[in-house]
Structures are given as structure tokens and as C-alpha cells.
């Protein structure tokens, strides 16, 4: 079966669901989850989310410096700056979608200070921030009329020009993505999902190791799928 959407989102953690919510006003979204929506690394994150919220005592430069030091200066500075400077706006988005960060008696964020941070800038929900974020985003995507959630199915291959009969290898220039093949493991059936935009938000690889605190779904299959069409670094 061939299904057509404006956006195909593969992965249902904070990255996948927040992207789906941001673009849903522009068209139909398919959100693919290889297990249940609750099972993602996001759900198991406890401490909180770091963001500059009080410019009287904190600033972006401090946060950027703290992050670079904690990463032993091997972090991509451009990426660090982007994440730090855009964090407050993303926090507002999470709140808009229903995330309830703890506040003090003054109605201000109850900020914590964690390892590597020079200031109090950790927003949290008790000690289960990830679960609060995941649960809130699940409710938001489930009530959005333009988002269709497909659980217990997963991507096995992305669609490139080979879908049009063109031979595609790692060396093919200007490889384009047209969607993905999605497998239903219960039936063994593979459906073709076509989309104008495809986002891979499949998380990490923790579960490929013998010892990990990651959930079993963190197998890195999304990374492996994309590597099929990525030229190795010189």
C-alpha cells in the first residue's frame, strides 16, 4: 500500500513529536513509532532541561562556555551556540504544549544547578522531567487533527531516486529522500510512505551494548538506514 503525507516523522521522542507539532499546521503528518509512544529515551530522562531564563544572573555566553568546557572543547561550537540561544523559545513551546515545569512560591521557575553549570538554570518537573515532557507531547500529538500516529511499526529503508528506477549508491550526487518503507512486524507487510519532507528522529544506540540504561528500542536502526546513503568521511 502506498500512503502519501506532507511530512513523515520517524521516531516519537521529544525531537520527533515536537517537530510533528511544529509543522502540523502546514499539512498532514505521519508519526512512526516502532513501539508504543511512551517508550522513548525522553521518558527516562530525570534531571531536567538547561536554559537561560534569568538574565539578571545568567547569560548565553556563560551557558555556552559551560557547555564547551563540559565537552572538553570538542563540541561543535556553532551547534552549541544555536541550542543555547534558542533554548528559551523551545521551553516556551514545551509549556504551550502542556509541559508543567516546577515553580517556587513566587511563581518563578524552580531552577536547579547541576554538574558543569556555573548558574542555576535547570528547569525540571520533580525528578521525572522526561516523563512529564513525553506525556505532555503524547497528549498534544494525539489531539492534533493533522497528525496520524502509527505505533508498533518501523522504517526499514528510506526512499531515494531508486524508487524511481535510478541506481543509487553512496557516490550518487544530490541524493533525495521521498519517504520510507515501513514494516508492520506483526503481519510482515511493508507499506510505502511518500512525503515531501522526511525527518529521522530515531534516537541513539545504547541498546546495542550489553549494559545500558537506555530502553530496548534504542538500537540505532535509523542511523544505520541513513548511513546506507551517506558517503564515508575522508
Regions inferred by a protein language model and the residue ranges of each:
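Alpha-helix C-terminal capping segments
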Residues: 21-26, 201, 227-228
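Conserved N-terminal/central alpha/beta ligand/cofactor-binding core
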Residues: 28, 33-178, 183-189, 207
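Extended, hydrophobic alpha-helical segments in both membrane/secreted and soluble proteins
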Residues: 198, 218-225
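Conserved small/polar residues in nucleotide/adenosyl-binding loops
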Residues: 229-234
Amino acid at each position: 500500500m502506498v500512503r502519501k503525507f506532507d511530512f513523515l516523522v520517524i521516531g516519537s521522542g521529544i525531537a520527533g513529536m515536537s517537530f510533528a507539532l511544529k509543522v502540523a499546521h502546514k499539512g498532514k503528518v505521519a508519526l512512526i513509532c516502532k513501539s508504543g509512544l511512551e517508550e522513548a529515551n525522553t521518558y527516562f530522562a530525570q534531571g531536567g532541561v538547561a536554559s537561560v531564563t534569568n538574565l539578571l544572573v545568567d547569560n548565553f555566553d556563560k551557558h555556552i562556555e559551560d557547555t564547551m568546557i563540559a565537552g572538553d572543547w570538542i563540541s561543535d561550537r556553532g551547534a552549541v551556540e544555536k541550542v543555547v540561544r534558542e533554548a528559551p523559545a523551545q521551553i516556551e513551546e514545551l509549556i504551550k504544549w502542556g509541559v508543567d515545569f516546577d515553580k517556587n512560591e513566587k511563581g518563578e521557575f524552580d531552577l536547579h544547578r547541576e554538574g558543569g553549570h556555573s548558574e542555576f538554570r535547570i528547569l525540571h518537573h520533580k525528578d521525572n522531567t522526561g516523563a512529564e515532557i513525553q506525556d505532555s507531547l503524547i497528549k498534544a500529538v494525539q489531539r492534533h487533527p493533522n497528525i496520524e500516529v502509527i505505533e508498533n511499526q518501523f522504517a526499514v529503508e528510506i526512499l531515494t531516486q531508486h524508487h524511481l528506477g535510478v541506481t543509487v549508491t553512496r557516490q550518487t550526487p544530490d541524493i533525495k529522500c521521498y519517504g520510507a518503507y515501513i514494516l508492520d512486524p506483526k503481519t510482515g507487510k511493508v507499506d510505502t510512505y511518500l512525503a515531501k519532507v522526511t525527518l529521522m528522529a530515531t534516537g541513539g544506540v545504547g541498546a546495542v551494548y550489553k549494559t545500558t540504561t537506555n530502553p530496548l528500542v534504542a538500537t540505532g536502526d535509523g542511523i544505520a538506514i541513513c548511513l546506507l546513503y551517506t558517503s564515508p568521511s575522508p
